Amino acid sequence: ESVDIVHGDTNKVQFGMGTYGSRSLAVGGEALMKALNKITDKAGKIAAHCLEASEADIEFKDGQFSVAGTDKSMAFGDVALTAYVPHNFPHETLEPGLEENAFYDPANFTFPGGCHICEVEVDPDTGTVSVENFIAVDDVGRVINPMIVEGQVHGGVAQGIGQALLEGCVYDDSGQLTTGSFMDYTMPRADNVPDMDVGNTVTLCAHNSLGVKGCGEVGTIGSPPAVINAIVDSLWDLGVRDIAMPATPQKIWQAIAVAQTSQAAE
C-alpha cells in the first residue's frame, strides 16, 4: 500500500517492447526486481550514513533499514526523504535522489504446464454440445497474485470453449467474409461456459529470480483440445474419431452420419 504504480506514461518510464506472449511478470517483473535491488542498495548506503554505521551492517526488512545487532533503524520513507532533501549528505561519494532504471532481456523462455479436463454432453440427434464441467490445474511457477492467475485461466478457458465450439472465419463463394461482426461471429455467452474448478501446482522457474512463468495463455492452450477430446470420446462408440474446430452442431451431426454409414458398409 506504500507503492503507487504509474501505468503507460512514457514520460515517466523508458520505452518497452510490450507485454505480449505472457511476458508481464516473467519479463517486466524481473526488470522491476533489478531496479528495486538498485534502489535498496543505494538506500542502504544512505541509511548507513544516517545511522552512522557500516554499509555491511545494514539490513533491510519490512520497510525498515536497521543496524545489525542494535535497535537503530530508519524507515524507507525517511531514507527516501533524505535522498531528496540531502542535508548533511555525502555528496562526494553519493548522488542525491533515489531513482533507478533497469533492463531485462531473458536468456531463456518460461514454460508453464498443466492439465485440463472437460466434461460434455452431446445430443447425437442434433449435434448440440453442452459443456457441463471444466477442471484446470496449471503450473505457472510462483503465484504472485492468485486472483489475477485465476482470472486469466477463466478468461482463457472461455475463449478456448469458443474456439472449440463456435468461433470461425467464414467466407462466401465470392471471398466475402460473412462473420465480420458480432452479429454473425458466434462467441460463447455465460450460459455456454460452466463453473470451473481452477487449481495450481508450483514448480519455480529456473530462469528468473522470481520463479514465475507466464499465465496469460494457459487457458486458451489447454481448453480447446480438452473440449474436442471430450466430444470425440462421447461419440467414440458411434465411430467418430475426429472433429475439426469449431465443432458446430452441423459438423458433429455430419461426423456421426459419416461414421454410421462407414460402420454400416463394413
Language model feature labels by segment:
Residues E1-E266:
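Cofactor-binding beta-sheet edge motifs in enzyme active sites
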